[in-house]
A protein has these predicted regions:
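Structural preference for solvent-exposed beta-strand-turn elements
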Residues: 1-438
Length: 438
């Protein structure tokens, strides 16, 4: 277990890049694995979660070759060429990898067993397993197949399904659409609110027959997926920590280049702008079918805001660091409709309220969100990440504007999504204001 010590720097300025998008990296590996021919991926996120996805597709018989940093060749097995793995597949901390892989495995005529770390074994998998079972797959595991370790045995063909998802979840949607590749008819998923659409964009690029009508997505089976070139853009969820730091730290100005700004993922930018942050967007070319931009922000006086409704799925992963921004804003911020945060890597609602509270923030926990009274002066303290990478980095950002020294415990988890986070912040500060401790 490691910890990080944070002290407020005198400045935060500069231009940096962030690692490849985690969601797109997972999909590039999985879609390439079931495509015919070669998929060449550049900008792949070489962090623990996505590296575990590569291990999983290798375990299923797919040849994956590393050509250089973030550069991989995936020689796909096609829809009918995956092989039964010899051992249990361990996905570490990645809920995305497990749920998406379950969709692929639902169409394979063999048993595959999946597990993960302590945190992942607590997360709900029944939201994917239940509809896959209705399609004809067999899913067994703890708590009636709703918790890892899980065993999945697929069927061919799977039954077509029209599924009304109770949650806006790109992971659920993607799992069912992937299973639909082996179905006997169209598979339709309708969500209460539209979730991120990386799957729709990327599967279409690989050759799948998809149609989108508002909150409903339909996949019609029968098309062969073909290997593609995938240039993964920078991860907006990683950029979020730097953008918030650049907004709340005194005298700061930060530019993050090459960031994916898909509208279904860019809710944090809209929320920060609503709070008064001057977020500049310089748009460039598309990458992996996704809009890309250089993002710039600088110190600003923020004001509280109401954040809820359809914007929540567009910024669900960024709520921890958005809460840090709200602590520094003038007035009250209410975050609602975010109960999904309770079943992430940690109960993020409880963790945000409890850990930022240790720094002096005035936060009230609600069943589906948070109420934050801004303007409190943050003071350094010892805080716990709970093994949650986004909590760990959000607490580090809070430490950048707190008086004194902040120590964030259990920070190895940062490696699951942003291994270079500490080095990037120190580069912007021009000093070692963030220091890893044994």
């Amino acid at each position: 277990m490691t910890r990080i010590r944070v002290r407020a720097p005198k400045r935060l300025s500069g231009t940096v890049e962030v690692p490849g998008d985690k969601s797109i990296s997972h999909r590039a590996a999985l879609f390439g694995a079931i495509a015919s021919g070669r998929t060449e991926v550049t900008g792949y996120l070489e962090a623990e979660d996505c590296l575990n996805t590569l291990k999983a597709v290798r375990a299923l018989g797919v040849l994956v070759t590393r050509k250089g940093p973030g550069h991989y060749l995936v020689d796909g097995a096609g829809l009918f060429g995956l092989r039964e793995p010899e051992q249990v597949i361990d996905l570490g901390n990645s809920g995305t990898a497990v749920r998406l892989l379950m969709g692929v495995l639902a169409g394979q005529p063999f048993w595959t067993f999946l597990t993960g770390d302590d945190s992942l074994r607590r997360r709900p998998m029944g939201r994917v397993g239940e509809p896959l079972t209705r399609m004809g797959a067999t899913v067994v595991g703890r708590e009636d197949g709703s918790r890892l370790p899980l065993g999945v045995r697929g069927a061919r063909p799977l039954k077509a399904i029209a599924y009304d998802s109770p949650v806006a979840s790109a992971q659920v949607k993607t799992a069912l659409l992937l299973a639909g590749l082996w179905a006997d008819g169209p598979v339709t998923v309708t969500e209460p609110v539209r979730s991120r659409d990386h799957t729709e964009r990327m599967l279409t690029g690989f050759g799948a027959r998809l149609s989108v009508d508002g909150r409903t997505v339909t996949l019609t089976p029968g098309a062969e997926l073909r290997g593609q070139g995938v240039a993964v853009p920078g991860d907006i969820s990683s950029a979020a920590f730097l953008l918030v730091a650049g907004t709340i730290a005194r005298g700061a100005e930060i530019t993050v280049t090459g960031v994916g700004v898909n509208e279904t993922r860019a809710g944090l930018l809209d929320a920060l702008e609503a709070m008064g942050a001057p977020v500049g967007r310089s748009h460039g070319a598309l990458a992996a079918g996704e809009p890309v931009a250089d993002l710039t922000t600088r110190s600003a006086t923020l004001r509280g805001a109401l954040v809820g409704g359809p914007i929540i799925p567009r910024l669900i992963d960024e709520v921890p660091v958005l809460a840090v921004a709200a602590c520094m804003a003038e007035g009250r911020t209410r975050i609602t409709d975010a109960a999904e945060l309770r079943v992430k890597e940690s109960d993020r609602i409880r963790s945000i309220a409890g850990e930022l509270g240790k720094l002096g923030a005035r936060i009230t926990e609600a069943p589906d969100g948070l109420e934050i009274e801004g303007g409190a002066r943050l003071r350094g303290a010892c805080v716990q990440s709970g093994g949650d990478h986004r909590m760990a980095m959000a607490l580090c950002v809070a430490g950048l504007v707190a008086d004194g020294e902040t120590v964030v415990e259990d920070t190895e988890c940062i490696r699951t999504s942003y291994p270079g986070f500490v080095d990037t912040v120190n580069a912007l500060a021009g000093t070692r204001c963030v220091e890893e401790l044994p």
